[in-house]
């Protein structure tokens, strides 16, 4: 027997696995409501937030339009099934940073919108919260086409591997 326990994202829940030592029975569940916060942990989190607040609030760019993961007319998330202005910008940025002919980013790695106006470093971290590394590789035209086709294989349905290209 293999027990699978997934808690979701953004720490919305904690996973709890209980093994009864007498019976060997295994149970799993999610904890989504908390009675009280641990004061030492909260103080630690607050100190980290304070330490990074200056860096995260630093303005690094601006935009005249909202940069989105959604369809502006319906509000439906589309970043994983079709192009968006934010996906295009991210792919453009990777192409520029890597001095490459083509820039690609998967829609599943783009996690937040950016409102029109000033863009902070914190906004960029919200869009790209993972510690992914930008990488440059040499590929053939066929390999590039194969990657694009693989990314679009579930269109029009959502797929975190949907590629935004520049």
Q: Model-derived features: where do they sit?
A:
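Hard-cation-handling environments
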Residues: 36-119, 157
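Active-site-adjacent helix-turn-beta-strand microarchitecture at beta-sheet edges
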Residues: 1-59, 155-165
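Short amphipathic
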Residues: 29-31, 61-66, 136
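Feature captures C-terminal
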Residues: 2-3, 13-16, 24-27, 84, ...
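A near-ubiquitous, low-amplitude feature marking generic local secondary-structure context
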Residues: 2, 31, 35, 46, ...
